[in-house]
Amino acid sequence: MAVPKIVLFYVFTPLADPEAIRLWQYTLAEANNLTGRILVSEHGINATVGGDIRDVKRYVKGTRSYAPFKDADIKWSDGLGDDFPRLSVKVRPEIVTFGAPGELKVDADGVVGGGTHLAPDEVHRLVEGRGDDVVFFDGRNGFEAEIGRFRDAVVPDVSTTREFVHELDSGKYDHLKDKAVVTYCTGGVRCEVLSSLMRSRGFGEVYQLDGGIVRYGEAFGDTGLWEGSLYVFDKRMSIEFSDQAKTLGRCSTCGGPTSRYENMPDDRGRELVLVCADCTENRAG
């Protein structure tokens, strides 16, 4: 019986021949019947793929056989079996698109000049010790935060990751430069870059949630500082860490509580829109 699984991971490390890595990763993933998206650049690899658990395990073992990827933090979750339409493996200037590849510096230990990594329990200790001096800073697209975010987090007004550089340069967050800023995102990759961009712009004390929201949810579920659902970039659209998750999202049609996204352009040109099950049924009827 097939057991569908999804794995998410990234590694920042210098890659002399990204195209060779792309070909190897495509061959490895295809041979194991996986679908999903893998991005490769001179800075490393960023992958989200899914398939049957036995195939995924073989892929993970093969990926870790390459020395620079041997310590990759693999995040596992349950899939649906048809979570991605196809397998896509591409070389790009960046493995997460901030539009600032020239600013990123990477060595064998990862991103140079990034924020200090904090495990979930270390984040709690920081908040307990520093209180209001600690600010959570969302490193995701704005729509993702509509259904879930850390309590009292700063959520930048961005619709794509490319807009973060302009946001940081706008000055609207300069009042946070003397705060303890904890950046967070889904699995950690965006905050690797975001935290380095913030530090280079004068933010004095920048941290990043190690392993992202995924690892935090595994550790604390809905009993900690996280509230709501987590948006994910596959057919599932969102996941919860427990049956106690709050519903923060609001239906774009009736205003009722929902965490359901649909691909449906609204009057602001957005394709992903929050629509509750009742409104979906009424529209279909």
From Swiss-Prot:
**Residues annotated as catalytic:** 185 (cysteine persulfide intermediate)
What's the top EC group for this one? oxidoreductase
In terms of PROSITE patterns, this protein maps to:
RHODANESE_3
Which domain of life does this protein belong to? Bacteria
Name the EC number(s).
Answer: 1.14.-.-
Which CDD domains does the protein's record reference?
A: RHOD_YceA (cd01518)
Pfam families, per database record: Rhodanese, Rhodanese_C, UPF0176_N
Q: Which UniProt keywords apply?
A: Oxidoreductase, tRNA processing
According to the entry, every stretch annotated as the Rhodanese domain falls at: 130-225
InterPro entries hit by this protein: Rhodanese-like_dom (IPR001763), Rhodanese-like_dom_sf (IPR036873), Rhodanese_C (IPR022111), TrhO (IPR020936), TRHO_N (IPR040503)
A GO biological-process term: tRNA modification
Molecular function, one GO term: oxidoreductase activity, acting on paired donors, with incorporation or reduction of molecular oxygen
Q: Which reaction does it catalyse?
A: uridine(34) in tRNA + AH2 + O2 = 5-hydroxyuridine(34) in tRNA + A + H2O
Q: What does this protein do?
A: Catalyzes oxygen-dependent 5-hydroxyuridine (ho5U) modification at position 34 in tRNAs.
Q: Which family does it belong to?
A: Belongs to the TrhO family.
Q: What is this protein called?
A: tRNA uridine(34) hydroxylase
